[in-house]
């Protein structure tokens, strides 16, 4: 990651390592097994070019996690591609189908 961050001028504010227990309760579990996860806080310039740089940086991080059988936390941002969501959360399409079934008027919404 260091090489990627340097090559792409990604400004890492900090990273934390957290131990996460397996989630057996959620329909879309983040942790499918006990994980040691890394949370990155990246400096984002809140202008179009800065947001685009952060989008690409997070997509590269998601790809790196997916290649290792990991996931990413769905609600941290909306930068994941459709393929990344489907790769990390194979039941996502089923989740959307069930949501539509149980919430046909789509009252429960998120701008995520």
Regions found by a protein language model. Give the residues of each.
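C-terminal substrate-recognition/cap domain of FAD-linked oxidoreductases
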Residues: 1-57
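Generic, well-ordered alpha-helical scaffold segments in large soluble proteins
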Residues: 1-4, 8, 60, 64, ...
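Active-site-proximal structural scaffolding
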Residues: 10, 54-58, 78, 88-91
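Short, surface-exposed linear patches
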Residues: 37-41, 61-63, 94-98
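Long, well-ordered alpha-helical scaffolding segments within enzyme catalytic domains
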Residues: 53-68
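Activity-critical C-terminal alpha-helical subdomain
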Residues: 66-112
């Amino acid at each position: 990651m260091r090489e990627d961050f340097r090559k792409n001028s990604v400004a890492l504010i900090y990273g934390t390592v957290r131990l996460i227990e397996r989630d057996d309760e959620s329909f879309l579990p983040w942790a499918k097994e006990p994980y040691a996860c890394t949370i990155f806080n990246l400096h984002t310039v809140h202008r179009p070019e800065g947001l685009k740089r952060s989008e690409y940086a997070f997509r590269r991080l998601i790809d790196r996690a997916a290649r290792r059988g990991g996931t990413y936390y769905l609600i941290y941002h909306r930068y994941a591609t459709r393929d990344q969501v489907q790769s990390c959360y194979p039941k996502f399409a089923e989740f959307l189908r069930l949501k539509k079934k149980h919430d046909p008027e789509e009252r429960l919404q998120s701008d995520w």
